[in-house]
Amino acid sequence: YIEFPDGLHLFFYDTTMNVKSELTANYGISWENKKLMEVKDDVVITNHDKNEVLNTEHVVWDQAKKKIYSDVFVKRTTPDGVIYGEGFDADESLNSWKLRKPRGEFLFEEEEN
């Protein structure tokens, strides 16, 4: 395994090598043989395309399944407001997120009849 006791800053790129998202944490560990990375302690994930930021204390990146997830409290800040949850699931590219047990303020547009 490779340990990052002083933290890490990862960049995720699209096919044209533009930075789509970033992940920072104060600690990380990567198990190359398991294709698994765990980061914790002030984890911040930024999705530049959607102008969203997710804050939490623990994230697992399962490279074999191409999934990123957490089982602890998360705060997701979007242009429309702040939503809280008890964990999240996302695809590896961080384009699709699903908060577990979400709560907060939600904006809905009413349909006209």
Where in the sequence are the language-model features?
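Mature-chain termini and adjacent capping regions
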Residues: 1-113
